[in-house]
């Protein structure tokens, strides 16, 4: 199993404030999004996170979940992100689970929730990956 905590964030993840938090034994991988002002898509009086920021979270968290389930190099080949409500510019919990990791393809589901007492679900997504090595 890959030690996900030892992997450095990509430059894009670092720019978005996306960091690895933990991997659970049940296959859930958790990341934290601390969005900078550059990740916003709206202005005052009601700023919100840009949809591209949330889609990047689906891609990255899905990759972490797939890599944990079956290490060996994966590349996203398909991505879907459903935006359920405006995402406030606050920290968010990004949780992913690998649904399937085969010899050549893998699929992960992702939930993005506000990281606060309400834990409102703001987006869900699914990412598919193709193995790039071996």
Give the positions of each predicted feature.
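Hydrophobic beta-strand-centered segment that forms part of the acyl-chain substrate-binding groove
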Residues: 63-93, 98
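Catalytic strand-loop segment that frames the active site of acyl-thioester-processing enzymes
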Residues: 16-49
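Compact, glycine-rich, soluble single-domain proteins
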Residues: 45-59, 63
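A generic structural signal for short beta-strands and their flanking turns/coil linkers
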Residues: 14-16, 27-29, 73-79, 90, ...
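Hydrophobic residues in beta-strands and at strand termini
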Residues: 33-35, 83, 131
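N-proximal, solvent-exposed amphipathic alpha-helical segments enriched in charged/polar residues
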Residues: 1-11
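HotDog/MaoC-like acyl-thioester-processing domains
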Residues: 87-89, 93-134
């Amino acid at each position: 199993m890959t030690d996900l905590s030892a992997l450095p964030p990509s430059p894009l993840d670092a720019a978005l404030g996306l960091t690895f938090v933990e991997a659970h034994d049940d296959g859930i991988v958790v990341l934290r999004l601390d969005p900078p002002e550059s990740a916003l898509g709206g202005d005052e009086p009601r700023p919100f996170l840009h949809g591209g920021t949330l889609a990047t979270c689906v891609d990255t968290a899905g990759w972490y979940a797939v890599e944990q389930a079956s290490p060996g190099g994966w590349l996203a080949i398909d991505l879907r992100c459903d935006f359920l409500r405006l995402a406030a510019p606050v920290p968010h919990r990004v949780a992913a689970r690998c649904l399937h990791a085969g010899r050549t393809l893998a699929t992960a589901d992702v939930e993005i929730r506000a990281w606060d007492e309400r834990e409102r679900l703001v987006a869900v997504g699914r990412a598919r990956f193709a193995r790039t090595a071996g």
